[in-house]
Amino acid sequence: VTVLRELYNQLPQESVIYFADTARLPYGTRSPQEILQFVQEILGWMAQQGVKMVIMACNTSSALALEAVQGHYPFPVLGLILPGAKAAVRHGQRVGVIATSATVTSNAYQRAMVEAKPQIQVWQVACPQFVPLIEGNQIHSPEMRQVAQTYLQPLMDQDIDTLIYGCTHYPHLAPVLRTLLSPTVQFINPAVHVVAAAVRELDALGLRRSGVAQPTQFYTSGPAPQFATVASQWLGYQPQVQMLPLSVLQSPGAGVESGIAAAIAPTPNPTVPPLDNALSPLLT
């Protein structure tokens, strides 16, 4: 929910539809073909809601599906990789990336950074144990610290000056990671930068809304109470969550993605209570 929190910070006037594809987690171990299929299903459903923008708030789906789906929907689709990479090259020369296995294998961050700054040096580490520990509320446990030490050691050995959170779960680990890395290391949270890109895009398109936002609408493909409990710890309030069965996403005419995606809706749709210019995050 780190992207959602940034939406609240930078675009408080926008209403949000938030979709979490919890039934098909984790995305980080899925094949590129599976991830693309999930993304298309989710985006199709978002299109039915009349959204005006989608932020694909999952690094794995941003890395493996964004280019394939951009330009195929009646709204802009933004991803995390490019905004995060651009921020990193502005801050450092020796960049570490911690991410899921799928994101690391895609080399999406490395390609984006080298394209922006050919002399940049990049090291990537897959961190598959982080998400289960975070979702198990084990952020401050001895096990988390030991796992983090193991994952970060190769990056510390390279004397990195910048670290990218290559998964939207990872900013929750800041208290742990900052105790392990040099205080001079810059931390890059792509969520901050993708929402800043969304602000610029909305302004350029004349779609930015003014006024008071309506309450965020939360949907999940898995059990709603479980997601509500976890999300409440990170949001500071208890969200009202509705379950959206996979059968709805997979029906003809529907399409979606996994991970957090933010969509902004200009027109009402009978499937969802009408929203005036709503932002909708899709979460993996």
Language-model segments: what does each one mean?
Residues 1-284:
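Non-catalytic structural scaffold of enzyme domains
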